[in-house]
UniProtKB/Swiss-Prot annotation:
Primary role: Transfers and isomerizes the ribose moiety from AdoMet to the 7-aminomethyl group of 7-deazaguanine (preQ1-tRNA) to give epoxyqueuosine (oQ-tRNA).
Signal peptide segment: none
A Gene Ontology term for the protein's cellular component: cytoplasm
One function term, GO molecular function aspect: S-adenosylmethionine:tRNA ribosyltransferase-isomerase activity
Subunit structure as annotated in this protein's UniProt entry: Monomer.
GO biological process: queuosine biosynthetic process; tRNA wobble guanine modification
The protein, known as: S-adenosylmethionine:tRNA ribosyltransferase-isomerase
HAMAP family, A to Z: QueA
Length: 349
């Protein structure tokens, strides 16, 4: 299966670089996986597609202001993007500089604070800060907007590049399907008799990395930390018992649940995952999906194609471009029901 099979033309004007005035103001493209039928709706119309007894699973990770600017004590500006918080004072980070800092180098952070480079792990640097990491990031860090947004972060991004239900700090990218939900919509969903559960997957910067191989099967995913608690397992079992559907809000929720059910049986799980879901991979847990529109040739588009079927997904994306939907993190959304017999690119006549 070729990465190029997942390419499509996207006008630059359709890339959403700012959020809408209201979280729920987005459009919603509904894709019925079994038939491929499309419906053009508004995001609050999601309520029309939910049923009493359904279970919605959200990712409650909280985006940290993970981008820092500073300079080496010896001179030379640099940029730090925290990838993972290891403990109260240590992180793994990407460092962009004209010359990479050496072990033992001291980094002076703009706004106050400093860190020492204590080790290098392949492309990541282990940094030890002189003060606690999370308060430092809150004080002087910048929100790590995706590269395609192509602008400096603004004060409003601290609120809008964050879900209203974010709890556990650690992500360096937002689980963007959740950005469409405000408290009023969540209350209406609950009033309809739809249950909710929360997993945690700390989204890493690797989510924006392009696939650099020609064949999908040769790609290796970056690792991200996740937790699916026993309470989620119990909620899903109860949902199944009452005939409800498991609806994942975002691809990170899908990857969390399917990682915890890799052997076909859902179990509580806490640890790293590198699960790569592409056409041909089965789904053991998720019945429906709320998701944003993803980049061409991205692993997330491959996941959606595995869920809805390749021809159905690519036809939906072509329709989204034709109808002027807004793409990527601050863009519009889809609601997709799983295709029980999805076809891949190789199945096309």
């Amino acid at each position: 299966m070729r990465v190029a099979d997942f390419s499509f033309e996207l006008p630059d004007s359709l890339i959403a670089r700012h959020p809408l005035a209201e979280r729920h103001g987005s459009r919603l493209l509904v894709l019925d996986g079994p038939t491929g039928a499309l419906a053009h709706r508004q995001f609050p119309d999601l309520l029309d597609y939910l049923r009493p007894g359904d279970l919605m699973v959200f990712n409650n990770t909280r985006v940290i202001p993970a981008r820092l600017f500073g300079q080496k004590a010896s001179g030379g500006k640099l940029e730090v993007l925290v990838e993972r918080v290891l403990d109260s004072h240590r992180v793994l980070a990407h460092v962009r500089a004209s010359k990479a800092p050496k072990v033992g180098a001291v980094i002076l952070i703009d706004g106050g604070g400093e860190a020492e480079m204590v080790a290098r792990h392949d492309t990541l640097f282990e940094l030890r800060f002189t003060e606690e990491v999370l308060p430092l990031l809150d004080r002087v860090g910048h929100m790590p907007l995706p590269p395609y947004i192509d602008r400096p972060d603004e004060g409003a991004d601290r609120e809008r590049y964050q879900t209203v239900y974010a709890q556990r700090a650690g992500a360096v990218a937002a689980p963007t399907a959740g950005l469409h939900f405000d408290e009023a919509l969540l209350e209406k969903i609950a009033d309809k008799g739809v249950e909710r559960a929360f997993v945690t997957l700390h989204v890493g910067a690797g989510t924006f990395q392009p696939v650099r191989v020609d064949k999908i099967e040769d790609h290796h995913m970056h690792k991200e930390w996740l937790e699916v608690g026993q309470d989620v397992v119990d909620a899903i079992e109860a949902c199944r018992a009452r005939g409800g559907r498991v609806i994942a809000v975002g691809t990170t929720s899908v990857r969390s649940l399917e990682s915890a059910a890799r052997d076909g049986v859902l179990k509580a799980f806490s640890g790293d995952t590198d699960i790569f879901i592409y056409p041909g991979r089965p789904f053991h847990v998720v019945d429906a999906l709320v998701t944003n529109f993803h980049l061409p040739e991205s692993t997330l588009l491959m996941l959606v194609s595995a869920f809805a079927g390749y021809p159905e997904t690519m036809a939906a994306y072509a329709a989204a471009v034709e109808h002027g939907y807004r793409f990527f993190s601050y863009g519009d959304a889809m609601f997709i029901t799983r295709n029980p017999a999805p076809r891949g690119p190789e199945d096309q006549a």
